[in-house]
Amino acid sequence: MRWQEFEGEVRRICEAHDFSTKFRFVFKDEEGRAEIDVVAERYGIVLCFDAKLYSASRYRASQLRREAEKHRRRCERFSALTGKRAIPVVVSLIDDSLRFHSGCIIVPYHSLNEFLTNLHFYLAEFGFL
């Protein structure tokens, strides 16, 4: 699977859970241009997804932590621009014990359906509700 297909799969799964989505959402602010792979909204909850297609040979937990920090910052910028509270979520193809870092939820791809099905539980668990 290529990264474009992976992003599309994240979007498709969100739509299957009745989220309205914006795909490859680009915005510009005083810090410059930024892109969020999938913005998914349902019942006033806005999830901003960054899809990471790491192969096992390229994957490092430290790299995922850095990406989570960068994505959280992008989501803060998105929130400031739109006035909507964005919840940052990184979806990784590689499963790792890391589930939350620096204000960003980390979901393994194979758990995305379960995460969206039990969304309110996870949002409460990580302090978003």
Curated annotation (Swiss-Prot):
SUPFAM superfamilies: Restriction endonuclease-like. This is Uncharacterized protein AF_2330. It comes from Archaeoglobus fulgidus (strain ATCC 49558 / DSM 4304 / JCM 9628 / NBRC 100126 / VC-16).
